[in-house]
Amino acid sequence: MASRSASKDIITLRGSAAIVSEFFGYAANSILYNRAVYPEESFSKVKKYGLTMLLTQDEGVKNFIASLTSQLSEWLEAGKLQRIVLVIMSKATSEVLERWNFNIVTDAEVVEKGAIKEKSDKEIMREIQAIMRQIASCITYLPCLDEPCVFDVLAYTDTDVDAPGTWVESDAKLIDNPQMVKLHSFDTKIHKVDTLVSYKKDEWDEEE
């Protein structure tokens, strides 16, 4: 029994890439739901990370996120992904309103030498839970998005990466003088993910 439970603590590069890419898929869904980018009724509830999570039922968005997480997993396994940014923009003007940053630090030794690390599934899940709870409570610290919005995803990779044809070069979609909130991090011992949301200052704040 002891050896069976110990084996669950072993993290491989491929396993870590799967954890991080899956996390981003659920995080993206949660952001789109909690920021009301898509209607509440277009999401369904599922259990994940010991929490009730929301997943889009919009076929276009589902396919986009599925394709995205598959590509992210490939880049993560190659040690080539530095950051993922989910950008929320005004549908009418394309003005950037929020940038959800997921900064990734990869253990180079694991990529180069195939080393394995140890960390319990429960510990990783607890760290991810903390981030998901912060995303779910974002209405308490982010301004209301009172206009129709759209989203995009930026991936920052090493310069030697050949991106698939579905990806195009993009500007950074920055926000002038943004407000920032640092969220929790999680670490598989191979990939460390730091989370930060930056957002456009509310007009009321600017008048004060």
From Swiss-Prot:
Main function: Required for the execution of the mitotic checkpoint which monitors the process of kinetochore-spindle attachment and delays the onset of anaphase when this process is not complete. It inhibits the activity of the anaphase promoting complex by sequestering CDC20 until all chromosomes are aligned at the metaphase plate.
Pfam families found in the cross-reference section: HORMA (PF02301)
Top-level taxonomy: Eukaryota, Viridiplantae, Streptophyta, Embryophyta, Tracheophyta
Keyword terms of this UniProt record: Cell cycle, Cell division, Mitosis, Nucleus
GO biological process, one term: cell division
Residue ranges occupied by any HORMA domain in the UniProt entry: 14-197
Compartment list: Nucleus
Signal sequence residues: none
UniProt keyword Cell division present: yes
Protein family membership: Belongs to the MAD2 family.
This protein's GO CC annotations: cytoplasm; kinetochore; nucleoplasm
Keyword Endoplasmic reticulum in record: no
Protein name: Mitotic spindle checkpoint protein MAD2
